[in-house]
Amino acid sequence: YVKVGELIGTRHGGFFDQPIHSTVSGYVVGFEKKVHSSGQTVDCLIVKNDKKYVLHESCVSRTDEEIAALTKDDYINIIKDSGLSGLGGSGFPTYIKLQTKHPIDVVVGNGVECEPNLISDYKLILERSHRIIEGLTYAMRATGAKKGIIAVKKKYPELFEVLENARHSFTEFDIEIKRVGNHYPQGWELDTIKHATGIEVPVGKLPAEYGVTVFNVATLYGFYRAVKRRMPITERFVTISGNGIK
């Protein structure tokens, strides 16, 4: 029997390992070959969902005192053990970004969805704005950045408002909510950096070389879950659209 958040395997990559956690509770009923989103056929552990979603015993919230005592290495290990990867589409392990040797001055939260029909981050910001800001503060602590920025489109004043209200709960941090353009591809990392910070990162260069690191707002929410609640990535907001929906 496995529980939500329980470690059930490890993905061994060419340059890094990623833990895999159960997203449901239930009994293991076997192994099967399945086609991964990458197109590769991989081994899968099959867990029969009992719909109870029983949390694993390890998923216990940290106190504010415990979080205040965390070091940079602690943050890296927490994020690594949570399996958190870029939720803006890259799927790149988040802990790798935290291991940069470059000094980071500013963390940018990307809340700009520029592909047609996508509104999952929009919905996440509306419903989890406080947690996103809290996740941003953890990312700032993990990188040593003194400045945090969350970028959203100008055409969504409601997103600016909820984030601005949430920001006031974290007055000890220098956090700014920036309204950027509505054009495509505003959500592209380098374009977001340019319009949110004024820093131009040349194509082919890493943002960290210019003192910037960027995380999607869903990834920042993942920071909150991992650091505060000791929860790995077991769920996310998704967009379903099209004429076939009934």
List the model feature ranges, each with a label:
Residues 146-246:
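Hydrophobic alpha-helical positions that pack around
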Residues 26-28:
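Conserved hydrophobic positions within beta-strands
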Residues 55-56, 107-121:
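Gly-rich Lys/Arg/Thr-decorated short loops/hinges at beta-loop-alpha junctions or inter-strand turns
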Residues 11-23, 37-41, 55-57:
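Short, Lys/Arg- and Gly-enriched loop/turn segments at beta-strand edges
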Residues 40, 58-60, 90, 97-98, ...:
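Short acidic, glycine/serine/threonine-rich loops at helix termini
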